[in-house]
């Protein structure tokens, strides 16, 4: 007889229709559900850590490069438009224990102007987004996160 272990997974507990908040889908790499503020620079991360110490910060990039390691390390989550399970973003985020979604194909980041577009919808730096590092989904706004047990029979 085999005993299957259950594990706790962070999932979203939507108070409204999730389809109304849906921004896009990518490849879930690591972590579970996370809601936080969208950020683009190390300076923004440091400012939010002072202004709102308890908030999660989600770094957005079209793609990451090795020079982004400080930002990735300082942020709580990572969202990229490109990449796969073996991409720089995915490997580093997984190794650092960060919630991460890569290859969100309808995401376009303008790092210089500090905003992202999901199709026609613009999300600016400091606004809330929600990512699911297990499912790969991305949602607009701050969403309640709960712990769910998975894998038990």
Language-model features and meaning:
Residues 1-153:
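Non-catalytic, soluble scaffold/interaction modules
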